Amino acid sequence: MMLQIPDVLTSDEAAYCRGVLDAAPWVDGNVTSGFQAAMAKNNQQLPQDGAAAREIGAIIVQALNANPLFVSAALPRTILSPLFNRYGVGMGFGDHVDNSVRRDPVTGQTLRTDLSITVFLSDPDDYDGGELVVEDAYGSHLVKLAAGAAILYPASSLHHVTEVTRGVRTASFFWIQSLVRDDAKRGLLLDMDVAIQRLSGAVGTTDPSVLSLTGTYHNLLRMWAEV
């Protein structure tokens, strides 16, 4: 399941985040790379334990936890502290698959990476290239979203970032361990949740059909969740 989540941050919030990040020190992006990724990676990254990363990371996590679409789609159990990368002219990131398990250097937690998320912080008109390209059974998907929007996709996906040819692309990226590890099951639960919300709007939250479907949703989640 691949899902665009618009307006995670407002335009003003995204601009504030960019301002803080632009003033922060950046290092070579291979600091956090696994072996495969290091062979393909050419970007800059913000130190994860720095003040800027902590401040902006907290803003992003708070915004995601308040976003109903993200919560419904990801069913987050643990969210890794956000990381930040920057691509200037000539920089890109070749094909790779993210590590299956990661340790959060900020919290010390170890998590299974079920989902990857990128929150775009640069306006798409401010740079050329820099598209996130995610591969799945249906082909290649090019993603370049408005500042403040996010893309959520399975961490098992082969993906890359195309070379930037003008401007600078700044984004936050990180991983989520879901309550439901199986992507297909998460997709079914999201479809059911969306359908329940639509039905509730049409017939009311106390309608017997809404109550029945809500019960079925929670019983499926109870069956599949790992806590």
Swiss-Prot record:
Annotated 2-oxoglutarate binding sites: R169
Source organism, top-level taxon: Bacteria
Ranges where the Fe2OG dioxygenase domain occurs: 78-178
Residues given in the record as Fe cation binding sites: H96, D98, H159
Keyword Iron included in the entry's annotation: yes
Disulfide bonds: none
UniProt remark on cofactor binding: Binds 1 Fe(2+) ion per subunit.
Cofactor: Fe(2+); L-ascorbate
Alphabetical keyword list: Dioxygenase, Iron, Metal-binding, Oxidoreductase, Vitamin C
GO biological process, one term: intracellular iron ion homeostasis
PANTHER family: PKHD-TYPE HYDROXYLASE YBIX (PTHR41536:SF1)
Taxonomic source organism: Caulobacter sp. (strain K31)
An example Gene Ontology molecular-function term: 2-oxoglutarate-dependent dioxygenase activity
Keyword Transmembrane among record annotations: no
Xref: Pfam families: 2OG-FeII_Oxy_3, PKHD_C
UniProt EC number: 1.14.11.-
Cross-referenced HAMAP family: Hydroxyl_YbiX
Name of the protein this chain belongs to: PKHD-type hydroxylase Caul_0045
